[in-house]
């Protein structure tokens, strides 16, 4: 039976999930997880405590409990359960208070809540990335923080959205299609913003697999076409001196991190 895991918070539980996933990913086993956000009252906390205790009774093993609870009364209820507690906030806040010489002022929903200017900036970035996805329009390229380039299905859209959602970066993206291959060049709107261009590439065999699942046995998905497009686009990157990374076998988080590392774009944390 897979070990049971609870991610609990009086907010969104995103912090608890991220912390827990980072720790548990070090172990080569599967976990059965349950996320419980917005545990904002003692009544809710007692119900969660019962769930944890029932899990212990059913499995005979203490479940792992990762939590980021601001309210100390609610936190104490979770402490009193039969779970193995991993308290993200208290583990680090107390030593930091001593080091900084000031007392923390916990505020509910501060980490991932709606925070006026910063929240609006993130929403603006997300809207921008959606409106400027896949070359839908070239009107707003001058306002982009970064413009991702690449062949179809190489990871442009998820990378753009991740950059906007996670870091508040206005990321547009532009595709090069099979019709472009005979005379591959940058459109004028991209030439004007050459300093913002960043290329994505991918192994042709992997691209072939992805496209086959979308349009099987078509010219678009053929290995020959995939090899041609990747070769032509990579040659253009080198010719135009556009930095690029290979997305093959990399998660969207890894791709975004590589992009930020190469470009030096500022991360807007929320």
UniProtKB/Swiss-Prot annotation:
Keywords: Kinase, Nucleotide-binding, Serine/threonine-protein kinase, Transferase. ADP binds at residues 150-157. It comes from the Bacteria. Its EC number is 2.7.11.33, 2.7.4.28. Pfam families: Kinase-PPPase. One of its GO terms (molecular function) is phosphotransferase activity, phosphate group as acceptor. It catalyses: [pyruvate, water dikinase] + ADP = [pyruvate, water dikinase]-phosphate + AMP + H(+); [pyruvate, water dikinase]-phosphate + phosphate + H(+) = [pyruvate, water dikinase] + diphosphate. The keyword Glycoprotein does not apply. Bifunctional serine/threonine kinase and phosphorylase involved in the regulation of the phosphoenolpyruvate synthase (PEPS) by catalyzing its phosphorylation/dephosphorylation. Belongs to the pyruvate, phosphate/water dikinase regulatory protein family. PSRP subfamily. PANTHER family: PYRUVATE, PHOSPHATE DIKINASE REGULATORY PROTEIN 1, CHLOROPLASTIC (PTHR31756:SF3). This is Putative phosphoenolpyruvate synthase regulatory protein. It comes from Shewanella denitrificans (strain OS217 / ATCC BAA-1090 / DSM 15013). The lineage of its organism: Bacteria, Pseudomonadati, Pseudomonadota, Gammaproteobacteria, Alteromonadales.
């Amino acid at each position: 039976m897979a070990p049971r895991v609870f991610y609990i918070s009086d907010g969104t539980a995103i912090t608890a999930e991220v912390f827990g996933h980072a720790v548990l990913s070090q172990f080569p086993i599967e976990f059965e997880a349950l996320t419980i956000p917005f545990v904002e009252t003692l009544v809710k906390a007692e119900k969660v405590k019962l769930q944890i205790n029932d899990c212990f009774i059913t499995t005979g093993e203490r479940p792992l409990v990762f939590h980021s609870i601001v309210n100390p009364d609610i936190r104490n209820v979770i402490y009193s359960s039969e779970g193995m507690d991993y308290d993200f906030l208290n583990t680090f806040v107390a030593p930091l208070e001593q080091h900084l010489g000031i007392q923390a002022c916990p505020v509910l929903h501060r980490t991932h809540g709606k925070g006026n200017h910063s929240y609006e900036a993130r929403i603006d970035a997300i809207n921008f990335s959606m409106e400027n996805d896949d070359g839908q329009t070239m009107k707003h390229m001058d306002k982009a923080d970064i413009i991702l380039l690449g062949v179809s299905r190489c990871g442009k859209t998820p990378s753009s959205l991740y950059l906007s959602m996670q870091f508040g970066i206005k990321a547009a993206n532009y595709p090069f299609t099979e019709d472009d291959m005979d005379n591959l060049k940058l459109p004028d709107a991209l030439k004007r913003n050459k300093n913002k261009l960043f290329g994505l590439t991918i192994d042709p065999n992997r691209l072939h697999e992805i496209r086959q699942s979308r349009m099987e046995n078509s010219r678009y998905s053929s290995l020959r076409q995939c090899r041609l497009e990747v070769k032509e686009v990579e040659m253009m990157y080198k010719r135009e001196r556009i930095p690029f990374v290979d997305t093959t076998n990399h998660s969207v988080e890894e791709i975004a991190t590589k992009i930020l590392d190469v470009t030096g774009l500022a991360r807007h944390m929320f």
